[in-house]
Design a protein with these regions (language model features):
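Glycine-rich, low-complexity intrinsically disordered segments
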Residues: 1-153
């Protein structure tokens, strides 16, 4: 016999903020999905016809954030830190990797979920597209690599 439970309330995806170490709160219009994949390692043992399966390497997909371009340079400056570090000039703070939280909120601003991305750093920055015939705002995006994510709340 089916049991009737409490109705579920699904989380809306339109309200979220991003908190980045040393950058503060940032408003973005879009955030790509978070995903993790565990490789499936198969091997055959002792002539068995059925493979043994076990978890392999874990990979976390990069996340892309998009927002309207403003005079704020924080994301570009962060990328510049990474560029200087990777060029071997040694002119930057070794702590270019930062933690960031993606905070999903309800309509009234109550935190529903908090995803923590650990040791993130920008791999790509796109300044946006310019068009004399367009009415839209310039949208900049940054793609971030990170070590792992976890659901905090």
């Amino acid at each position: 016999m089916a049991v009737i439970g409490n109705p579920r309330s699904f989380h809306k995806k339109f309200k979220f903020i991003v908190e980045i170490d040393d950058v503060g709160h940032a408003g973005f219009q879009k955030c790509s999905e978070l995903s993790v994949e565990v490789a499936n390692v198969q091997y055959f043992e002792g002539g068995s016809l059925i493979p043994n399966k076990s978890p392999g390497r874990v990979t976390f997909a990069d996340v892309t954030l998009e927002r309207g371009a403003t005079v704020d340079r924080d994301l570009f400056d962060w990328l510049q830190d990474v560029v200087v570090t990777s060029s071997g000039l040694g002119l930057t703070d070794p702590y270019y990797k930062r933690n960031l939280d993606i905070v999903q909120q309800d309509r009234d601003g109550t935190t529903l979920r908090r995803w923590c991305l650990s040791r993130a750093w920008p791999t790509k920055f796109v300044a946006g597209e310019w068009d004399n015939e367009a009415d839209e705002n310039v949208i900049e995006s940054v793609t971030l690599a990170y070590d792992f994510f976890e659901l905090i709340q």
